[in-house]
Amino acid sequence: MVIRKYISIITLNVNGLNAPTKRHRLAEWIQKQGPYICCLQETHFRPMDTYRLKLRGWKKIFHANGNQKKAGVAIRISDKIAFKTKAITRDKEGHYIIINGSIQEEDKQL
């Protein structure tokens, strides 16, 4: 694991990820950008659909989804960074998610 002095974060409003082609293109783009953290808005997933967020090299995936196919947010944290999760706060309607944790023993909130 490489230790850097900065954390690269990208955030995207994806306006729905139910189409396989869109998920594939997004995965390729994320891999090309190489961020440590990726925040996604408007995933439009139902709770049962979140398996679609899986991506090689990104084992930590946190999400908040409503019961309908609208809203939805997700935060992916790359395996390249040693993030230790302490607490997660989710909106049951899928509008926000807050993750408290630490990186190299320094507290962070995403």
Regions found by a protein language model. Give the residues of each.
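Short phosphate/oxyanion-binding micro-motifs
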Residues: 1-110
